[in-house]
Structures are given as C-alpha cells and as structure tokens.
Amino acid sequence: MDPEGLQFLLPPASLAALANSWLQEDCPGLNFASLVTGSAPAQAVLWAKSPGVLAGRPFFDAIFTQLNCQVSWLLPEGSKLVPVVKVAEVRGPAHHLLLGERVALNTLARCSGIASAAATAVEVATSTGWAGHVAGTRKTTPGFRLVEKYGLLVGGAECHRYDLGGLVMVKDNHVVAAGSMEKAVLKARQAAGFPLKVEVECSSLKEALQAAEAGADLVMLDNFKPEELHPTAATLKAKFPNVSVEASGGVTLDNLPQFCGTNIDVISLGMLTQAAPALDFSLKLYAEGDIPVPHARRS
C-alpha cells in the first residue's frame, strides 16, 4: 500500500482531538516562555538526524493546524531518511510554533521509529522467501494507539486487530473462564456472527487441534520455539488446511527468519511497538534571509 494514501485511513475528528489533547497535556495553563518570543511571524526547518523511515506526517500537521501554523513537506510519507536531511518547513506565530515543537517532534519521532522497525522486520522476513504477513500486536501505548498502528502500516507491516472489536481472540484466560476450549470457541463463534473471524491462542499441538476442531479461523501458536513451531504448524495444516496459523511470542528482528516457514501465515511482533527506538528529529528556527542549518549555534 502506498504510504502517501494511508492518511485517508485517519478520521479527521480523531486527528484533531488527539492533537488538542497532546497540546493540552503539555500546556494546561500558563506558558511563560511565550513572553520571550511573542507572536511575530517565524519559520523553522524540520531536520531528520537519524536513519529510518519517515512516518507521522498527518499527526505533525494536525498539531500545527491547531496552532495556526503551516507545514510544507519536502519528503513524502514513507521516505527512507539518510541524515542529515531537511524534511519540512513550518511557518507561523513564533509562540505557537514553539508551543507545538516538542509535541510534534515526539509524535513524529515515535511514529517514524515504529515504521522503521516494521520496515526492517518486513525486509528480514521477505528476504527468506517467506510470503506471509508481518504484524504488530495490541501491545500499544494507551492513548497513542492510532499513531503506533499507523506507523506499522507505513513500514509495510499489518496492524493485526486494531482493537477488541476487530477480531474475536480467545486467549488462555478465556478458556479457563469458559470451562473448556470447546466452550470458549463456540461462544466466540456465536458472538462473532458472520462478519468477524475467531482466533485462538494455543500453547500446544493438542490445544491447536481442539481449537481448529471447534471452529477457529486462526490459531496462534504462542511462545513456541522454532523447532517446535514448524512441526506443529505442519500437523495442524495437514488436518485443517483452511485454518490460518500465526506465530507469536519471543520473536525479535534477530530470530525472525527462524519463524518463517511455509505453514506460517502470520508472524506478530510485540517489539515493533514496545521496543522500537524513536528517530531523532529537530526543529530549528532561522531568521528570514539566513540559510537554515541543522545545528544552530549562537555566536
């Protein structure tokens, strides 16, 4: 999917609400630093200072839109960043530009970091010849899920389910609460109706076969070592060829190739949203007529 088109997935009302909440969090009261700058027109350059994938432009825009500032992008969403590179220019009242600076940088850095990790994971997996899907998980930061899931998409990975309503997932605790695997899956099937699929988390071949027999659409083989994963998936697929198999738990960028196999349809990595390092961006003001530089020095 073209990263530039992903912006249309984001509800404008959600973008505005998120931007407003982030700005409110950072400045809920008096902003004394604004007295230093006043409201004179100002301009700044956004610099990327670490390599990776650019992601999060719609959120960056939404923040500065709230502050009556204009952003002009020099690179498209999904661009590969080779530092140091000029990414965008921002213009607006000085006090508003600086009010949005840190919030916008934090959002862009986090989203780009996730996109970069996702892009690396997809590249690692496809380099093995595997044709399945790399996905994130629901292990996201409360209040920041839209940004993080969007970053996965820009990086070429799948969201998995966005929230609890996107897929009925039966986990080990559901099985305990329901009384048995069969009861849990049957109740999930009834709740799902025709629009939703049912996925069941399994920790053994026995559980996987029970889940498929009960009507699961997807079986997650959770925390399997690669040497156990592939024989289990092969046995499951041989008996239930229409059931999709997901590998999850303990997967990192380093060991990802070991989880790729012909009987694995999806590999999900919690680390894409939990452990991806943020990229380094800076926003530097410059005087009209001066040449913008990434590291401004006072003389």
Swiss-Prot record:
GO CC annotation terms, alphabetical: catalytic complex; cytoplasm
Xref: Gene3D superfamilies: Aldolase class I, Quinolinate phosphoribosyl transferase, N-terminal domain
Keyword entries, A-Z: Glycosyltransferase, Pyridine nucleotide biosynthesis, Transferase
Top-level enzyme category: transferase
Gene Ontology molecular functions: identical protein binding; nicotinate-nucleotide diphosphorylase (carboxylating) activity
UniProt cross-references to SUPFAM superfamilies, sorted A to Z: Nicotinate/Quinolinate PRTase C-terminal domain-like, Nicotinate/Quinolinate PRTase N-terminal domain-like
InterPro entries in UniProt: Aldolase_TIM, NadC, NadC/ModD, Nicotinate_pribotase-like_C, Quinolinate_PRibosylTase_N_sf, Quinolinate_PRibosylTrfase_C, Quinolinate_PRibosylTrfase_N
Residues that coordinate or bind quinolinate: 102, 138-139, 160-161, 171, 201, 222, 248-250, 270
Catalytically driven reaction(s): nicotinate beta-D-ribonucleotide + CO2 + diphosphate = quinolinate + 5-phospho-alpha-D-ribose 1-diphosphate + 2 H(+)
E.C. number(s) listed in UniProt: 2.4.2.19
Pathway the protein contributes to: Cofactor biosynthesis; NAD(+) biosynthesis; nicotinate D-ribonucleotide from quinolinate: step 1/1
Annotated region described as Important for hexamer formation, given as residue ranges: 8-12
Keyword Lipoprotein in record: no
GO biological processes: NAD biosynthetic process; quinolinate catabolic process; quinolinate metabolic process
Family statement: Belongs to the NadC/ModD family.
Its biological purpose: Involved in the catabolism of quinolinic acid (QA).
Subunit and partners: Hexamer formed by 3 homodimers.
Protein name, entry field: Nicotinate-nucleotide pyrophosphorylase [carboxylating]
